[in-house]
């Protein structure tokens, strides 16, 4: 109550921020006449002036009013678009490293030009991040006219782009691209063999479009670069037929072999299921007689068994994937787009291929991975814009430290959002949807029908076809025609069916969008200028008639056929209507058979319907019901937030290690000479070897000198007569022995240096270190995955799984670095190097020639970690640094508590 009173007196924080930014808007508006008086050349010269002022120490905040005024004037001259005052506020919010929530149709693409221009003045690069290649190309081509006019260069970073073009795109002042491509380029840059091969030049400022889609929806799915592993295709087929013979339990503790937990997206074998599965595996010859499914040798069988069960019970055709040209193509559950070339990891994709009877492709091995959460937190400054961020403001603040500011609309919102209608069955619901569509058609009102899956969109399409109603379908199977369909969805009486609308990027203009037809007329060389002008005028007049007719009919009507598990996605669908103050309306039609209601709210809503004795075909429409559904959505959102937070807490451990490895790699690439590092490694390896055979502070009787002689010969190629030395000098101390062995090793390596030229040997050393580091890092990633998948079981032993994971991951990491040192020392000591051909043999990286780029399914990425206990949040430091690198005397980032130079800094 007190907070409400304070808010009434002082206004909310959002209102106070908007008022604060409005003061700057006045300053920008005051500069407008002077900017209009400048010639094009004088306006362009302002960019160079701003750059010099920044170099001389003036802050971007001081330059902001003038810079924004320049961009506004440039937009007016080049694009015939003048930034509104609220768009200037949006630009300031984005420059401040915050999230701007702007309604659909408020001109987010134009707003982005303001902070992009201002931050490009630093010369460090600006990354404008979009959700797909089409939008990246469209926005870059559209806005590059303005940037080029003002003297800035623009690059487009697309997938499958040649290496040289990518480097050129990143060298530009402003680079447009997709979140996936920026992330994959970062990973690829940390897999190269020379510094010149890298494409990115540091992570300065990222401006993320559809920020909720990228930083929240896709945060559960790590980016993974993988290569094919050697698994038998037959195993997937056998597992598929065995899984099909297992019986699903109707209740969690009922009869059957396995239980499907739809809430946590997991499958669990029962005791009976274990026995049945073992019998079937033994029958198929996959399990030795008398052995258990959980013997160490059979762990991979458990992994494949669960993958097959999940493929059959949790992944459904035309909802989670489609079958196209004999391949399984994943469908993005948030945008409804097909994600061609993406594959689920950990054998799940192969299990789905076996289930659908298509060609099974081999399982992948992870070469490098990172989550969007950890990638985007590496930028010096991060900001984003979206139409729907307020519902996720808490998560943006918690995970990314980003504040959300709701920007006022240019014109007041006129859309009417009606209460949900809830029916008993899906059949009744769809009949009500058809009736509503028919009513809209009679009025000439355009309708957009939103669905949560391809299956539902095709079901409604079928019913509309039977009712002889013309319509357009927009889903992942049709995205080639996507922009055209959306552009015309506002025509009178038009019916458009669409899967989730996030990231579509094209506004629905009431009366239809004539821009495409106008462009065709202008491009027609056979028409005279007079004919073109006449046709365009007629087209615009026709559009105005249609536009007025749609306004009179009530604007665009949105029909939702199911509530999504996130309120934000529902709001995105609603937000398609009522753009820029247009009229519009929206209503959701639901049934107790819908997935969200069935899992979370059917009992409560069903009880209300029972009490009211609702007849068939009648809907319940009440604020209580809408509130119950919103509470169900909040539950799912809360659970999904916990999953993402959980994933981040686990990935933070890998991220600290990734930071150390990538810093080592970059130092190796940039170092002119790694000879000192090799020598330090050699000393460490010799000390470890001596400690194995001559334990510290041990008696001479406990020394295994013959064993040490053999180890030095086998591992380092050193023939040192240690026994003879001890016989000749019985008082020889352990330290003297150590010094003698190190001197002998150094002498042997110096002799090797004299045989090969110094540049060739330095190149060889660098190649060996990079190759060894890459190979063992890859194996370490697989080990971390396996550790994470089973770590939740520690909770049964009253241990905190997260702390256990952190402890064991550190032990694995330390062991990996010891292995790298040992391997590098062995190779450099034992391999003969005579020419550059020997170096090239080491530098070959065959696994990079046949790689795939994918999002892992979030459950696979997380394993069963959501079952584990809560642990405290970890502060995250990341490799691509905005500040100074880790100093030699600083605490090691791995969390050991030692100084960096005494821990993982030893490697460098």
From Swiss-Prot:
Gene (UniProt): secA
Single biological process term from Gene Ontology: protein targeting
Chief localisation class: membrane
The UniProt record lists the keyword Transport: yes
Record-listed ATP binding positions: 87, 105-109, 507
Alphabetized SMART domains for the sequence: SecA_DEAD, SecA_PP_bind
Keyword line: ATP-binding, Cell inner membrane, Cell membrane, Cytoplasm, Membrane, Metal-binding, Nucleotide-binding, Protein transport, Translocase, Translocation, Transport, Zinc
UniProt EC number: 7.4.2.8
Protein name according to UniProt: Protein translocase subunit SecA
Location in the cell: Cell inner membrane; Cytoplasm
Binding annotation for Zn(2+): 892, 894, 903-904
GO MF, any single term: protein-exporting ATPase activity
SUPFAM superfamilies: Helical scaffold and wing domains of SecA, P-loop containing nucleoside triphosphate hydrolases, Pre-protein crosslinking domain of SecA
Cofactor: Zn(2+)
UniProt organism field: Methylobacillus flagellatus (strain ATCC 51484 / DSM 6875 / VKM B-1610 / KT)
Span list, region Disordered: 860-898
Matching Gene3D superfamilies: Helical scaffold and wing domains of SecA, P-loop containing nucleotide triphosphate hydrolases, SecA, preprotein cross-linking domain
A Pfam family hit: SecA_SW
Reactions this protein catalyses: ATP + H2O + cellular proteinSide 1 = ADP + phosphate + cellular proteinSide 2
Manganese in keyword set: no
Membrane-related topology note: Peripheral membrane protein
